[in-house]
Amino acid sequence: MPRPEPPPWLSAAAIATAERLLAGHRQAFGRPLLAGVDAGRTPLQAAQELFVAATVVLSHDGAADPRLIYANRAALLLWRRPWGAMVGLPSRLTAEPAERQRRALALEQARRKALSGYSGIRVDSGGRRFRIQNARLWALPDGGGQPGGQAAAFSNWWWLEPPRSGSPPPLSGRPNPVGGTEPGPSVLPLHA
């Protein structure tokens, strides 16, 4: 019997991105992104731990109009998007239009060096605004050690307004790779 396909956040590409996220953060800030994720973990274990972490972690590629290439479970829940809708989304769309220029300037600064203490306003899939505070931004190295995108991580955020009428309900449970959510434990199995 063939092995089932892993969920998209445990694909070979996502595992490689998770490794780059963790290595890039350590290089930029001199400390691990997540407590307990150390060199003794396999890349698969580190990718699983990064995906289920309470800290919001996301990254985009280095294109002229960058697109998200990774979002952990906390990011998917906050932006109320399943993996397939979040990954591939132009990253500028995670911020409201009035914040996009300010965001672009901060990203340019982070491209040259790491940036901590970033704050800004973001918008979820239904248009509901929230503030992030004390985010860390850093260059995401490509396979050759050159900048190949950027990453962000933050734990401090809060809603700026009540849910909008007609907004999609918040995701709860475990994000489903096909879309929507399914209830489940906080630790994901190796295969969906």
Predicted regions mapped to residue ranges:
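PAS-family sensory modules
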Residues: 1-64, 107, 136-171, 187-192
